[in-house]
């Protein structure tokens, strides 16, 4: 919805902002008013509401960038053990082949999936949480990596996308933060395609800040944290490129 000056929702939201709301509701009103004043061309006012909403959410989460710095370090440490257990799979299979579209959140994965899944042989699955849900313990080294563990992970994931595929030989998974699990993806799915979407850093970071992510992207509520996280992401992608250069197709959003 684009707001106009005469929109009756605006005074209602402004009156709500001035009341004693619980913090979660106050945060949502801040983001809503940021959108209102952006549409009205009052950019400074919009930014002030964005800053307030993001700062409140960061306080609620008690997040520090050091949490993600440790996470990225553990991912690198676990990668070697995962790589040592890369599966060999038959090229002849009735199961669909995954196409992973990944990168920073807000980097264009949705558009890329729309383009790829418009092909008659591709089914679009959207953002699946299965790589994280079933594989995070392997990716960060919490669970001992073995060929058996990776086979079990592969089986669970392929069973899931088989139900979505509707007979299509390829299925896209556009969960952006699957970039954290590239070692596991390459070891469990040697046949998989990986598309890394990259957008201009300033556009990506700003888009993370202005969108309200209530779940999962704890770094996104501070511009400083976003910039640090973006640097961690770039370093990790360079690390993956050293080992999986032939597996990752890099696509610039601005080139589309």
Each model region followed by its residue ranges:
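Alpha-helical solenoid repeat scaffolds of the TPR/TPR-like class and their adjacent stem/linker regions
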Residues: 1-164
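PAPS-dependent sulfotransferase catalytic domain
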Residues: 122-125, 129-145, 165-256
């Amino acid at each position: 919805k684009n707001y106009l000056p005469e929109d009756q929702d605006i005074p209602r939201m402004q009156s709500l902002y001035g009341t004693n709301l619980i913090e979660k509701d106050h945060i949502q009103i801040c983001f809503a008013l940021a959108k209102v004043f952006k549409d009205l061309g009052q950019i400074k006012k919009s930014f002030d509401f964005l800053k307030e909403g993001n700062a409140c959410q960061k306080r609620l989460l008690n997040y520090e960038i050091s949490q993600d710095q440790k996470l990225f370090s553990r991912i690198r440490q676990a990668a070697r053990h995962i790589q040592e257990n890369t599966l060999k799979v038959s090229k002849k299979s009735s199961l669909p082949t995954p196409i992973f579209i990944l990168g920073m959140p807000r980097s264009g994965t949705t558009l890329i999936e729309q383009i790829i899944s418009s092909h008659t042989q591709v089914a679009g699955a959207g953002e699946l949480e299965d790589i994280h849900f079933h594989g995070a313990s392997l990716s960060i080294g919490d669970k001992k990596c073995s060929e058996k563990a990776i086979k079990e992970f592969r089986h669970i994931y392929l069973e899931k996308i088989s139900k979505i595929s509707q007979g299509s030989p390829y299925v896209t998974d556009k969960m952006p933060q699957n970039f954290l699990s590239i070692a596991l993806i390459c070891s469990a799915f040697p046949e998989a395609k990986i598309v890394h979407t990259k957008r201009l850093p300033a556009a990506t970071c700003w888009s993370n800040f202005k969108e309200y992510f209530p779940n999962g992207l704890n770094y996104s509520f501070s511009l400083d944290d976003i910039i640090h996280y973006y640097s961690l992401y770039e370093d990790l992608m360079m690390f993956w490129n050293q080992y999986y250069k032939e597996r990752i197709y890099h696509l610039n959003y601005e080139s589309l």
